[in-house]
């Protein structure tokens, strides 16, 4: 994935091109003042390529079409050096006069100084834009944007064999801004095809998170099987908007009656679904600063009635509440079902920054009633005990009754500083939600890798049915191909030991250590020496997850990609997702124990191949 080149000219070559801004280049630049310039497009070319300095200050580009303002872009135009280019697609404006009124940051003393900014000699027209990968940390089998910033997944639905993944995207830089709905599709949840931008900012503001449903009965009035999107329009205030698609989510029409819902305080990330027992649509809306979820109902996806609110004083109240989801799951061993409400918060996660908490309970179509513990309290439960799984939401209309989710694999504490340039952030692996009972009688949510991922496995390079380990580490080579990318599976019986350690490392003495503490019944993940860690004080960390199974033996599945490790214990009952940035690929797995011998069973190391 992400090796697809849809267009041809290398971006790096453009950085060296230093094309003169003249009539011959098809671009004319007029410097009107120390922080104001005009870019006039006079030639032909599909893209206007803008040079970006990733750490630079933001410039405002007002796009004028035949002299009238069409939209505004925020771009970190290069002042000192060009890190990369981003494309403005001029195709929709063909036949019109296109001008950009550019407001650059203050700090230039004269027009002469302003004209020396690196951007002005590197702006160019081109018929092509290259998205081939230039990043050593781009994952092999995780979804990433071809270029630009990405955060929350949103609007996900399944239709006619295709998984649609939309996401918060900045197509004009690798830091947060210009939020649109990027779009990718897959038939196997592994290999993702980049699609054109789906929904872009308009006069109501940026396009924040939301959800999509397939309106099979045509209740919204846009025809049967239309895809309906609800999203937050974010400007000075946050309002809710609707768009619809009649081509299976490739392009969307903006509803002229937007906004369809307004509130006096921050409310965002509408998540909707059809509630069959009451024959109505249900929407959850995050009342962000009030730490609650608002529950609305509608007959037609346009007119919404507030029915109840949930969350006041419950769960973690430390940060804003965002990105809700609500779905029903069967309770194993019974004929009952329970509802699960996902609530993403930032900050307030168990190890700092952003994280996903959840509640189990009952839902009658209007009100969510949470389960309580033996003391009558509503416990705080976490979906993932790593640092890097946020904004987890599910696909609507997933096949075979599945509840399949995906998250943003980063953390708001340091996402903008991660050591990549062409793109920032990946998604987690897709996961299947399930319920299980803990020793305390409470219901908990499991999160296991989606079954499609098994297709990536090649013949294992290591396969050991049983071995004993002690203080002296036993070391195994990771697959030589694909930078050591692999899936590791094993069962750990601590036997007489107190701790069992798994260390994944490289020749630069960088490593991640996973430790199973048999007495505490916990598993921890130490990435303090994992590679590049100094880009943020919040990145070096040890995360710890409780184990929920009663026995002493723990089963692990560990997915190692170029910049992440995802650990699933006991079929996803305990999960940790953490990003890593080793200076060279990991090459070895070492196993050891302290306090006595431990037993390892069913160790396998699988090379992973996404495309088959």
Where is each model-derived feature located?
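Beta-propeller domains
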Residues: 64, 144, 160, 165-195
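Boundary at the C-terminal end of the N-terminal hydrophobic targeting segment
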Residues: 18-23
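Bacterial N-terminal signal peptides
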Residues: 8-16
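Beta-propeller blade signature
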Residues: 182-186, 241-248, 295-300, 354-365, ...
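Hydrophobic core segments of beta-strands in well-ordered, beta-rich domains
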Residues: 50, 100-102, 152-172, 194-198, ...
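Bacterial N-terminal signal peptides that target proteins for export
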Residues: 1-8
């Amino acid at each position: 994935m992400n090796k697809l080149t849809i267009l041809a000219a290398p971006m790096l070559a453009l950085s060296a091109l230093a094309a003169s801004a003249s009539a011959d280049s098809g671009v004319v630049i007029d410097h009107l003042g120390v922080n104001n310039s005009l870019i006039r497009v006079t030639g032909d070319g599909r893209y206007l390529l803008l040079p970006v300095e990733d750490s630079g200050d933001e410039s405002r580009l007002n796009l004028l079409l035949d002299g009238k303002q069409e939209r505004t872009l925020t771009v970190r135009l290069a002042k000192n050096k060009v890190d990369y280019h981003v494309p403005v697609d001029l195709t929709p404006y063909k036949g019109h006069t296109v001008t950009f009124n550019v407001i650059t940051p203050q700090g230039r003393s004269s027009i002469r100084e302003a004209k020396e900014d690196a951007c002005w000699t590197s702006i160019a027209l081109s018929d092509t834009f290259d998205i081939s990968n230039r990043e050593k940390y781009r994952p092999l089998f995780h979804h990433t944007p071809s270029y630009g910033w990405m955060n929350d997944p949103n609007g996900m639905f399944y239709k006619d064999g295709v998984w649609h993944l939309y996401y918060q995207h900045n197509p004009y830089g690798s830091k947060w801004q210009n939020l649109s709905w990027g779009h990718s599709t897959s038939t196997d949840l592994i290999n993702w095809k980049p699609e054109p931008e789906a929904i872009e900012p308009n006069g109501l503001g940026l396009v924040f998170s939301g959800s999509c449903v397939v309106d099979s009965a045509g209740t919204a009035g846009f025809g049967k099987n239309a895809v309906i999107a609800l999203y937050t329009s974010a400007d000075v205030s946050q309002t809710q908007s609707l768009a619809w698609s009649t081509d299976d989510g490739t392009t969307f029409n903006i509803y002229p009656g937007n906004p369809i819902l307004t509130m006096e305080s921050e409310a965002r990330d509408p998540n909707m679904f059809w509630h069959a027992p009451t024959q109505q649509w249900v929407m959850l809306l995050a009342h962000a600063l009030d730490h609650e979820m608002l529950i609305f109902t509608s007959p037609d996806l346009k007119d919404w009635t507030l029915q109840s609110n949930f969350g006041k004083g419950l769960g973690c109240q430390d940060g804003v509440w965002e990105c809700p989801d609500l779905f029903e799951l069967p309770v194993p061993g019974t004929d009952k079902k329970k509802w699960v409400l996902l609530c993403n918060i930032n900050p307030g996660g168990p190890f700092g920054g952003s994280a996903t908490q959840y509640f189990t309970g009952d839902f009658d179509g209007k009100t969510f009633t949470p389960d309580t513990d033996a003391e009558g309290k509503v416990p705080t439960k976490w979906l993932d005990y790593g640092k890097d799984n946020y904004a987890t939401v599910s696909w609507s209309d997933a096949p075979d009754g599945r509840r399949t989710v995906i998250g943003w694999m980063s953390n708001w504490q340091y996402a903008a500083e991660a050591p990549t340039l062409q793109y920032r952030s990946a998604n987690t692996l897709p996961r299947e939600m399930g319920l299980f009972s803990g020793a305390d009688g409470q219901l908990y949510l499991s999160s296991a890798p989606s079954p499609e991922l098994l297709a990536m496995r090649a013949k294992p390079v290591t396969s050991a049915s049983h071995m004993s380990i002690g203080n002296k580490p036993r070391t195994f080579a990771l697959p030589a191909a694909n930078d050591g990318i692999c899936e590791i599976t094993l069962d750990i019986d601590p036997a007489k030991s107190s701790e069992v350690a798994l260390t994944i490392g490289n020749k630069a003495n960088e490593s991640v250590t996973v430790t199973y503490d048999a007495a505490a019944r916990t598993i921890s993940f130490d990435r303090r020496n994992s590679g590049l860690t100094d880009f943020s004080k919040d990145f070096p960390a040890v995360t710890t997850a409780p184990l929920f199974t009663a026995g002493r033996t723990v089963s692990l599945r560990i997915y190692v990609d170029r910049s992440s490790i995802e650990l699933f214990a006991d079929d996803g009952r305990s999960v940790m997702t953490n990003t890593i940035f080793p200076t060279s690929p990991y090459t070895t797995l070492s196993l050891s124990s302290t306090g006595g011998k431990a037993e390892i069973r069913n160790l396998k190391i699988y090379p992973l191949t996404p495309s088959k």
